[in-house]
């Protein structure tokens, strides 16, 4: 029976498997197995796991860029059949248009609005991401963090139902990543968009998410779901934060002490 969006799950994945053809004839590389996942409207969910385990593959299936080998992927109650403008991707790679200004990048895709509404929308999200005064700047004149703010503002301006984020801060330096996490938390609290966020950074996941999905090695399953029931903004020195962070490290077979393995 097909689940509807009224059940509260805007993303519903059931018994999903994914394989890719190998180099040899008939060879199959099994990436995902028995994936079950539900995401509620307005929820912030992070996905972590070993490098190459299939985190981005799962996100691309939900986003409509890949089709699963078997199983069911529903978004807003309908089978995923391809990319949808109501669902926006934000990638690690710089996705802003270098030939457009900040204002033009944020307003890209708003052609259906009247000039007045488009200008108001662009101004609102320019302010929200802290880019006032840079409206006429081109991407080459901005830092990496500022370019990511442009991309986030452009995604929000389109008023999507869901935002998929694939390691959007992975290429930024540590201090800028911390600032971007804080900014994204503030923006999410204001907008309450559904966000599905892939990251290799466990601390980032615990700082941002309502729930963290911990994936196993390939062929990956969701081996654990960790609820992060901590107030925002998160205190990175608090017992609750450190406890959940360390729990996820151990779930992935890692120690928080460099050079040690979890037992």
Placement of each model-derived feature along the sequence:
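Conserved ABC ATPase "signature" region
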Residues: 116-134, 186
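Short coil-to-helix segment of the ABC ATPase nucleotide-binding domain corresponding to the Q-loop/switch region
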Residues: 100-107
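The feature captures the beta-strand-to-loop junction immediately N-terminal to the Walker
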Residues: 48-50
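A short, proline-enriched helix->beta-strand linker immediately N-terminal to the Walker B motif
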Residues: 157-161
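Helix-to-loop junction immediately C-terminal to a conserved catalytic motif
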Residues: 63
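Conserved ABC transporter NBD signature motif
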Residues: 71-83
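Conserved ABC ATPase signature
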Residues: 138-142, 146
């Amino acid at each position: 029976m097909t689940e509807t969006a009224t059940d509260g799950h805007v993303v519903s994945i059931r018994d999903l498997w994914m394989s890719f053809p190998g180099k040899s004839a008939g060879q199959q590389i099994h990436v995902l197995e028995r994936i079950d996942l539900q995401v509620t409207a307005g929820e912030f969910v992070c996905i972590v796991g070993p490098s190459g385990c299939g985190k981005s593959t799962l996100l691309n299936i939900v986003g409509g860029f890949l089709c699963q080998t078997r199983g069911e992927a529903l978004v807003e109650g309908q089978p995923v059949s391809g990319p949808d403008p109501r669902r926006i991707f934000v990638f690690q790679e710089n996705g802003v248009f270098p030939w457009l200004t900040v204002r033009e990048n944020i307003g890209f895709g708003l052609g259906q609005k009247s000039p007045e509404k488009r200008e108001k929308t662009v101004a609102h999200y320019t302010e929200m991401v802290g880019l006032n005064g840079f409206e006429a700047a081109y991407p080459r004149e901005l830092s990496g963090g500022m370019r990511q703010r442009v991309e986030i503002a452009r995604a929000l301006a389109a008023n999507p139902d869901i935002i998929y984020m694939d390691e959007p801060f992975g290429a930024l330096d540590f201090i800028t990543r911390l600032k971007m996490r804080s900014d994204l938390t503030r923006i999410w609290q204001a907008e309450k968009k559904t966000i599905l966020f892939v990251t290799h950074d466990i601390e980032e996941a615990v700082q941002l998410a309502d729930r963290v999905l911990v994936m196993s090695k390939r062929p990956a399953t969701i081996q654990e779901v960790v609820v992060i029931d901590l107030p925002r903004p998160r205190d990175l020195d608090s017992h609750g934060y450190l406890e959940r962070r360390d729990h996820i490290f151990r779930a992935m077979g890692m120690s928080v002490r460099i050079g040690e393995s979890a037992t």
